[in-house]
A protein has these predicted regions:
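Short, solvent-exposed coil/turn elements at secondary-structure transition points
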Residues: 8-11, 127, 236, 290, ...
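Short helix/strand-capping turn motifs
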Residues: 307-321
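Active-site donor-binding loop signature of nucleotide-sugar glycosyltransferases
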Residues: 44, 209, 317
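Generic structural signal for hydrophobic core residues of well-folded globular domains
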Residues: 99-100, 303-306
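Catalytic core of soluble alpha/beta enzymes
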Residues: 155-303, 322-334
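Active-site lining segments that contact anionic ligands and/or coordinate catalytic metals
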Residues: 28, 227, 254, 312-314
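N-terminal capping/lid subdomain adjacent to the active-site entrance of alpha/beta enzymes
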Residues: 1-178, 183-185, 190, 197-200, ...
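Long, contiguous hydrophobic alpha-helical segments, chiefly transmembrane helices and signal peptides
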Residues: 121, 125, 152, 231, ...
């Protein structure tokens, strides 16, 4: 077996506003695994200032090369060694799965892989000023999305609340589901709870990460008392061992967790999160993290497997149309 690392810099069609700033380019590292004339592709896609393994390019390549050499010799992924490097693990897992299946359809027995059913996805409204976000929101609604996700917490909350009200004036909660993601933009205390109450009056489905991570006492109180369900996202980053995952979920007791394999332990670690969440009746959905079509396809294939082709809620897998060049050879079609 031979494994090659290919750095790629993707260009966004339009600047992508996130809680960590505005992206115009995206650095990724493709994994090309070859064995007996069969090729498997994977994608390592760390996010600057967010991923636990967001290292300098030289550091990242050096470490990734070490792991690929080990896999070439042993034909085994060193899962325990890779726990602190989730984006590397996801890319290596994807390449091995592609190699072993011999197809972009990593799990060919699922209805999704057989093109017999799709995966419902939400329409994501990127950050911007209020006018930009309003236009993007209306476009998603025109495109027929029945689940809209709004990034909030960066602008004036009253203005952000008006966006939610605008949807509710047009559509009831049975017609359009609204999710909001605060990216830690609220402060613990009465002010946070008041905002949650205002969102609850508009039948918001859930809010992701209302306060910044590593405030577990405050977060547990919010999860217990919030009038709308709480979903954890950034809080899961860096929680690597199985015992830590159990402890976090048992203490905080969120209603949902949002899983991004590139950030939350690769597929191996994300499956641990799912197993522990199920024991506590915590629901989950999967979200991509600005991967190209190679990574997005791997996440979608895995999501179909974990969900057994049954979806009680929309997944966050609609980011494949962001890049100028996006590996169109991957047989992945994005629609509402």
């Amino acid at each position: 077996m031979e494994i090659e690392i290919i750095p790629e810099c993707l260009q966004f069609k339009k600047p992508a506003g996130t809680s960590r700033g505005v992206y115009t380019t995206r650095q990724i590292y493709l994994i090309k695994a070859c064995h007996n004339n069969t090729i498997g592709w994977g994608e390592c896609a760390p996010l600057p200032d967010l991923s636990q393994d967001a290292l300098s390019q030289d550091e990242y390549l050096t470490l990734l090369q070490r792991f690929t050499c080990e896999i070439e010799m042993t034909r085994q992924i060193p899962y325990e060694e890779l726990r602190p490097y989730p984006s590397m693990l996801m890319g290596l897992e994807s390449a091995m799965r592609h190699l072993h299946s011999g197809s972009w359809h990593h799990y060919p027995h699922t209805k999704f892989s057989k093109a017999e059913s799709g995966i419902p996805i939400n329409g994501l409204v990127w950050m911007g000023n209020i006018e930009e976000m309003s236009q993007r929101m209306q476009q998603k609604l025109k495109e027929g999305y029945t689940c809209i996700k709004l990034k909030i917490g960066a602008l004036d909350f009253d203005d952000e609340l008006q966006l939610v009200k605008k949807i509710r004036r047009q559509y009831s909660s049975t017609d359009v589901e609204i999710r909001v993601d605060a990216n830690g933009g609220f402060q613990p205390g009465d002010g946070c709870m008041k905002k949650l109450e205002q969102l609850a009056q508009l039948n918001v489905h859930s809010i992701e990460q209302p306060i910044k991570q590593n405030q577990l006492d405050d977060l547990a109180k919010i999860c217990q008392n919030s009038p709308i369900p709480i979903a954890l996202d950034e809080e899961l980053i860096g929680v690597n061992s199985l015992s830590e995952k159990k402890e976090l979920l048992q203490y905080v007791r969120p209603q949902y967790i949002v899983l991004k394999p590139s950030l939350h332990g690769g597929f191996y670690g994300a499956e641990e999160w799912i197993n522990e969440a199920r024991k506590l009746n915590i629901k989950w959905w999967v979200t991509s993290a600005l991967e190209s079509n190679i990574g997005l396809n791997a996440i979608a294939q895995w999501t179909a497997l974990q969900s057994n082709d049954q979806y009680s809620m929309a997944q966050g897998l609609g980011t494949g149309l962001l890049f100028v060049r996006n590996f169109d050879e991957v047989p992945l079609k994005l629609a509402k």
